[in-house]
From Swiss-Prot:
It comes from Caenorhabditis elegans. Disulfide bonds join C873-C884, C878-C894, C896-C905, C912-C923, C917-C933, C935-C944, C951-C962, C956-C971, C973-C982, C989-C1002, C996-C1011, C1013-C1022, C1029-C1040, C1034-C1049, C1051-C1060, C1076-C1086, C1081-C1097, C1099-C1108, C1259-C1285, C1292-C1302, C1297-C1314, C1316-C1325, C1332-C1368, C1346-C1382, C1357-C1398, C1361-C1400. Keywords: Developmental protein, Disulfide bond, EGF-like domain, Leucine-rich repeat, Repeat, Secreted, Signal. The lineage of its organism: Eukaryota, Metazoa, Ecdysozoa, Nematoda, Chromadorea. This is Slit homolog 1 protein. Functions as a ligand for sax-3 receptor during larval development. Acts via the sax-3/Robo receptor to direct ventral axon guidance and guidance at the midline during embryonic development.
Length: 1410
């Protein structure tokens, strides 16, 4: 005995803990380890065992036999089907058992017999159908029993009644029709939702219980019919009746249910469940069953081990269900089964172990399914099979190895399959020649030479392979059938040539053996998953150049690990996502030239590790901070072949100011956001379904290549035309049953392929004149069930393809303007005779289809209630002489006259405009420029700014910190406590208390915890990132930046490489001329004179002077930014130009106790003037200045008055009346522009000198004080500002670039430049550029009914030559002899004129030619 004891002590601790688990202080955690069975070597003294989130399928009798001390067992989220009746017999101290979210179908009797101390049992979300007393007996003090979301139709309650401690019983989502009241239970929670309750006398107890409970209003009756849908708690007892037969029929036991499952019938040893609406295979089947009939149900899946106890079963019929999945070993245990009927289902695939255990099977019917192949090993387990029907599937070929064990096969049905009768099916033809097993009349589909030939009549020598045909079906036993060469293309070797074939889409049937795919010179617009390029794993070269591609799905090239060359040049790409490149990409050559790409994300270049040649010339690359990723990549790959346009004017170094400057640039154009499916929606095969998803707005992230979009049954009230018109491939759009009010002009203008548009049952009141502009392909339009009164003819003028239109159930106003519609639908026969007139009364209820022209008259005025449907301004909503401007059918803007504000200009600007009173206090004007605040309860102070302290008598416990609220307080608890007063202690490692950081795993230990850290972290709470820079030395002065299990060397300017080992590149700027080298242009560009050694300076934005050394503008974008100038005189004028889109921000501040301040509030200038006469005087500008355009602001102080003028608007005056008559400060104060120092801002806000102390976000320029221009480089203090405004405002606001686009450019004096389209020039792109080009291409030459044998190089002249007097024409041609082939089979030689040179020539008139 002593020897044994010593041996136990010598066993290492790790030997008693399974390798997949973590064992800490009697707790064993094996969560998420993909375990398929309960691990061995679990310590015997374990108290808690966590096995959730694994793949365990069964619990054996001895799995927990040694764990007698176990108190908590977690087995949820596994695949458990089987539990032995002795599985838990040793767990005598078990208190909590969770078996939820498994696949348990049946509980053994007495399974919990020894678990007397069990208090919590969770069996929810399984497939249990019957729960009997014998299954539940054992526990004596059960408190919680969860049975939610099973298929329970019978529940015995004798054991449940005996549990006087039972507080929670959940039965939601089952199939219970009745449940007898448990006699002794005192439920705290009883959940009964979603059961088909039969509300008779037996449920009166339930009604009384629900009447007292709260939140149980979803418990409704299913039967009898007169009570269907009624909430049980509101019924009266007199309606809940029972007949005598029903009372006698009710039994308190599930014994009969165990014998024969509902709703089946059992006769002898046959179980008949035909046409019973079953959605799953019944579990409680009698063991003596020999035949089961389950045909014509709704079963979709056959789980593993579904029939394992039915050893006597000989026939099983599962035909005419909707089975899509047969799980592995589904029929295991059916050793005597000789007939299996599976025809008429939706089975697409069979696993190799699907029929394991069916050694006696003789007849197998798999006809009328959707099988595409037969895998290797599928029939290895059925050696006695004599009859196999695969009739009416989609099988193309069968490998010989698949049938090698079917030695007894005598009958095979293969008809109605698209068989490929090539060399890979010759083996079957040889067997059929010997045994004649194929008797169904199967025919060949491919190759073309054998199409429609009967399989049984073809000799084996006809089954041949030509060229690459042997590759097509070579791997049929792996369910892979390759494609033949597309009809539009030519295939030679492994090259597929589809160049210049006029293709609109990529052929979907490209063979996988292709190594080169050439698709140049077509009309392809999208590259999506439908093209199947992503499956061409052998592809090495892909040429998609010279197409119209605007969109590439992120996963289109995902699996092309062998792709070395990708050509996408000369397309219309605006974005190239890094998602297109796989992490393991071997791409070496990438051509993106001639697109519309503006920039690339840094992630893209992180993946482009093997690219040695890249071309992006001819794109719209932005020469600003967004080109940094490309510049950085170039520095690290300078030896590579690059074809990239230089950005001569953009300079960047790695200093802090440049980093901050570039950090603020917008990233939208460079983002890597892929084309995902919208939230809540489903996307499949370019069809997006968002029906009935409670959407309140048009969803984002809809794939650009979507063809069908379903948005019906939502709450959408507006269609964003910009987002919708990106979906240019859309053919069907369903917006019915929403809350749309109007259709605006050009809402669908880009949807040129849309054929069906359904907008029925909305709240449409208005169609704008161009509502359906662009819908030339529309055939079906439904506007039924709306509130439309007018149908403008112009809205329907583009509907040239319309065949059906529905406008019934609308409030149509049929005056003379509706006559056209009646005439139109009569001539086109497109309306079904449902639409009727509602107004005027003279034609009320008149069918439009049968109305006569004389009935449509304009004799009376249109009622205002109808006219305002499309123009709300007719109601004159704007006040105080404001001008109403209609912006859409249901929207308008009131342009207020100066001095008024509000949606309808109903309010006059006064001292209370800025809501100066805090905490919802009431503001009342006392006199011009002054106000009083009337506080709400709980506040006090001049501005009601002080909150009365409610923490004086707080009841916070356990170290909780009291936080004062309004008329209340809250307790901020320490980490381990919760509750209103921190009175409840939390358990560690729960959702509410997990101290482990950085994804560390929390393990509870006797009231405390331990953290198991993720790789890269350490510390008690995994709070410390392990320093990966410890042994790293960055070169050339670089500094190491620690990451998570990684590091980066932050290099000095010009250096690159992993360790900053790559020296700086050569200066890429053009060499300056001698004259410019001696210049000092400061913040500008030197322009040398061509005729002398002199030069001039072209200043950058924000600078002026002969040497560009005077700073005239300053940008504000950083927190705490400000400029400090010399003190302001008591009486003086300061003028500035402001550009901003912000609603708030400091403009200027001067003073201490006495002050003048100007700030933005709601986009207006708020001026506060105080010279010592309390209270301060307030004034707001009558106009807003935050529209992004430049505004000239002038502020003048003179004694008690302060004057404000914005642009050329009238001067506004505010007076601080009282004894003091001049603005005098205590000390020498600076004049602050754009913001305040932190201490000054806090003080100014505390004393209500300013409402908001944030710095301005925008630009201030051309500052003058008393008409003297200020050089901002001479400011006393300059903190966190920008030298110019290019990074803070949009200088393109309000700029019209005509035939081009405006881009911000810090190097331009005006801050912007117009980038003209290819055929235009000039400062604003309003001058057409003279240009005549020869455009070359390769195509067939056509003459009458003859075509050239080969494609030939030809050209056309295109361009603009300055007007009608000149034209772009060919001035040099050559002749070429070309061989032609004609439709009648003859050939000839034709002479073709090939253009060699194009230029502008005078236009020849017809008269001059004569």
């Amino acid at each position: 005995m002593l020897i044994c004891f010593i041996f136990i002590l010598l066993i290492p601790e790790s030997a008693t803990c399974p390798a997949e688990c973590v064992c800490v202080d009697r707790t064993v955690s094996c969560v998420g380890q993909q375990l398929t069975e309960v691990p061995q070597n679990i310590p015997n003294d374990t108290i808690r065992l966590d096995l959730q989130d694994n793949e365990i399928t069964k619990i054996g009798p001895n799995d927990f036999s040694s764990l007698m001390n176990l108190k908590a067992l977690q087995l949820m989220d596994n695949q458990i089907v089987t539990i032995h009746n002795q599985s838990f017999s040793s767990l005598v101290f078990l208190q909590k058992l969770r078996l939820s979210r498994n696949r348990i179908r049946h509980l053994p009797d007495n399974v919990f017999q020894n678990n007397l101390k069990l208090t919590h049992l969770d069996l929810s979300e399984n497939d249990i159908t019957v729960v009997s007393d014998a299954q539940l007996q054992g526990p004596e003090f059960l408190e919680v029993l969860n049975l939610d979301k099973n298929h329970i139709f019978c529940l015995e309650n004798n054991v449940i009644s005996s549990w006087v401690s039972l507080e929670v019983l959940t039965l939601n989502g089952n199939r219970l029709t009745t449940f007898e009241e448990p006699s002794n239970a005192r439920f705290r929670q009883l959940d009964l939702f979603n059961n088909p309750w039969n509300c008779d006398c037996r449920l009166r107890w339930m009604r009384k219980w629900l009447e007292k409970a709260e939140g149980q209003n979803k418990t409704v009756c299913a039967t009898p019919l007169n009570l269907q849908g009624s909430s049980i708690e509101i019924l009266q007892d007199k309606f809940m009746t029972c007949s005598g037969n029903r009372k006698r029929r009710y039994k308190k036991t599930c014994e009969t249910a165990e014998i024969c499952p509902l709703p089946c019938t059992c006769t002898g040893t046959t179980v008949d469940c035909r046409d019973s609406g079953l959605t799953y295979v019944p579990t409680n089947l009698p063991p003596s069953t020999t035949e089961i009939r389950l045909e014509q149900n709704q079963i979709s899946s056959i789980p593993s081990h579904s029939f394992k106890n039915l050893k006597n079963l000989t026939r099983l019929d599962l035909s005419k269900n909707i089975i899509t999945e047969i799980q592995p070993k589904a029929f295991l245990g059916l050793h005597n089964l000789h007939t299996l009927v599976l025809y008429g289902n939706n089975i697409t695939d069979l696993k190799s172990d699907t029929f394991e255990g069916l050694g006696s099977l003789q007849l197998l019917l798999l006809n009328a399914n959707q099988l595409t192949c037969i895998r290797r090993g599928t029939f290895d387990h059925v050696p006695k099979l004599s009859m196999l029907s695969l009739y009416d599937n989609d099988i193309k070929s069968i490998s010989e190895v698949t049938f090698q064990n079917l030695t007894s096969l005598s009958t095979l049905h293969l008809a109605k399959n698209p068989l490929i009768c090539d060399c890979n099916l010759q083996w079957l033809a040889q067997i059929n020649l010997q045994k004649n097993i194929e008797t169904s009349g199967a025919r060949c589909e491919q190759p073309k030479r054998l199409r429609k030939k009967k399989f049984a009549t073809l000799p084996p020598n006809k089954f041949k392979c030509k060229g690459s045909e042997s590759f097509v079906s070579m791997y049929a036993d792996s369910c892979f059938i390759d494609s033949i060469c597309p009809t539009q293309c030519d295939c030679y070797g492994t090259t597929v040539d589809c160049n210049k074939r006029g293709l609109n889409t990529i052929p979907t049937s490209i063979p996988r053996f292709a190594t080169q795919l050439l698709l140049s010179g077509n009309n392809i617009s999208t590259v999506d998953l439908n093209s199947n390029i992503h499956v061409l794993e052998n592809l090495e070269v892909l040429d998609l150049s010279n197409n119209h591609i605007t969109f590439i799905n992120d996963k289109s090239f995902e699996k092309l690990s062998k792709l070395r060359e990708l050509r996408l040049n000369d397309n219309k790409l605006h974005h190239f996502s890094s998602m297109v490149l796989d992490e393991q990409s071997n791409l070496e050559i990438l051509d993106l030239s001639g697109n519309n790409i503006q920039c690339f994300s840094s992630i893209f270049f992180n993946k482009a590790t093997r690219i040695r040649e890249i071309k992006v010339i001819g794109n719209d690359l932005l020469c600003d901070c967004r080109i940094l990723p490309l510049m950085s990549w170039l520095r690290s790959n300078s030896s590579h072949s690059i074809d990239i346009p230089p950005c001569q004017q953009f300079q960047y170094s790695d200093n802090e100011s440049d980093k901050q400057r570039c950090a603020a640039f917008p990233e939208e154009t460079c983002s890597d956001d892929s084309n995902l499916c919208p939230p809540k929606c489903s996307c499949l095969d370019r069809v997006v379904r968002c029906s009935n998803k409670n959407l309140t707005s048009f969803p984002s992230r809809i794939p650009f290549d979507t063809t069908e979009l379903y948005l019906d049954a939502n709450y959408i009230n507006e269609i964003p035309a910009h987002d919708l018109n990106r979906l240019y491939s859309l053919t069907k759009l369903d917006l019915s049953h929403n809350r749309l009010i109007s259709l605006e002009n050009n809402t669908f203008s880009n949807l040129t392929r849309l054929s069906t548009l359904i907008i029925s049952y909305n709240k449409l009141r208005c169609l704008q004149p161009l509502a359906f502009n662009g819908l030339n392909a529309l055939r079906i339009l439904s506007l039924h069930g709306n509130d439309i009164s007018f149908l403008p003819q112009s809205a329907f003028s583009n509907l040239t393809s319309i065949t059906h239109i529905a406008v019934g159930s609308n409030s149509l106003y049929c005056d003379c303007n509706m006559a056209w519609f009646s005439k139109w639908i009569k001539s086109k026969f497109i309306e079904a005779g449902i639409a009727r007139c509602e107004y005027p009364n003279t034609v009320s209820n008149q069918l439009l289809l049968t109305a006569q022209p004389y009935q449509f008259t304009c004799d009376s005025k249109v009622p205002t209630k109808l006219a305002t449907k499309c123009d709300l301004c007719l109601n004159s909503p704007c006040k105080n002489n404001a001008i109403c401007e209609t912006t859409s059918s249901r929207k308008y803007t009131c342009n207020c006259t100066p001095g008024f504000y509000g949606v309808h200009c109903e309010n006059q600007i006064d001292a209370c405009y800025g809501s100066p009173c805090l905490n919802n206090a009431t503001c009342k004007v006392a006199q011009a420029g002054r106000f009083n605040c009337y506080c709400n309860k709980g506040f006090e102070g001049d501005y009601c700014e002080k909150n009365i302290d409610d923490c004086v008598n707080s009841k916070c416990e356990n170290g909780g910190k009291c936080v004062d609220l309004i008329n209340s307080y809250r307790c901020d608890c320490p980490m381990e406590y919760e509750g209103k007063h921190c009175e409840d202690k939390l358990e560690y490692c729960t959702k509410k208390l997990n101290p482990c950081e950085n994804n560390g795993k929390c393990i509870p230990i006797n009231g405390s915890y331990s953290c198991m850290c993720s790789p890269g972290f350490t510390g008690n709470n995994c709070e410390t990132n392990i320093d990966d820079c410890k042994n790293v030395e960055c070169q050339n002065g670089g500094s190491c930046v620690d990451g998570i299990l990684s590091y980066d060397c932050l290099c000095r300017p010009g250096y690159a490489g992993q360790y900053c080992e790559i020296p700086p590149m050569m200066d890429m700027e053009y060499q300056k001329t001698d004259a410019c080298q001696q210049s000092a242009c400061g913040q500008g560009e030197c322009v040398a004179s061509q005729n002398s050694s002199d030069f001039t300076c072209k200043c950058h934005e924000g600078f002026s002077g002969p040497s560009c050394d005077r700073q005239m503008s300053v940008g504000f974008k950083n927190p705490g930014a400000y400029l400090a100038l010399d003190p302001l005189a008591s009486d003086g004028t300061i003028t500035m130009t402001l550009r901003t889109t912000s609603k708030i921000g400091i403009l200027l501040y001067y003073g201490d106790d006495h002050f003048v301040s100007a700030e933005l509030y709601d986009g207006r200038v708020k001026l506060v003037y105080y010279i010592g006469n309390f209270p301060a005087s307030h004034m707001y500008s009558s106009v807003k200045v935050n529209d992004g355009l430049p505004h000239r602001i002038s502020i003048r102080t003179s004694e008690r008055k302060c004057f404000l003028q914005i642009d050329k608007n009238p001067v506004q005056i505010v007076e601080n009346s009282g004894k003091s008559d001049q603005l005098i400060t205590k000390g020498k104060e600076m004049l602050y522009i754009g913001g305040l120092p932190i201490e000054k801002s806090q003080d100014a806000k505390r004393r209500f000198h300013v409402k908001n102390s944030e710095s301005l976000k925008g630009c201030i320029s051309s500052i003058t004080i008393n008409e003297v221009p200020i050089n901002l480089q001479q400011a006393l203090e300059n903190v966190n500002t920008e030298q110019s405004c290019s990074a803070t405002v949009n200088f393109c606001a309000g700029i019209d670039c005509g035939n081009g686009k405006c881009t911000n450019n810090a190097l331009s004096p005006k801050g912007y430049m117009c980038q003209c389209d290819s055929h235009f020039s000039g400062e604003h792109c309003d001058e057409k550029r003279i240009k005549c080009d020869k455009q070359k291409f390769r195509r067939h030459h056509i003459e009458n009914e003859c075509r050239s044998v080969d494609r030939i190089k030809i050209a056309e002249c295109n361009g603009y030559c300055g007007g009608e007097q000149n034209c772009c024409t060919a001035v040099k041609k050559k002749q070429r002899k070309v061989k032609m082939i004609c439709k009648n089979g003859t050939t000839k030689i034709s002479t073709v004129h090939i253009i060699r040179q194009c230029q502008c020539e005078p236009t020849k008139s017809v008269l001059s030619e004569k």
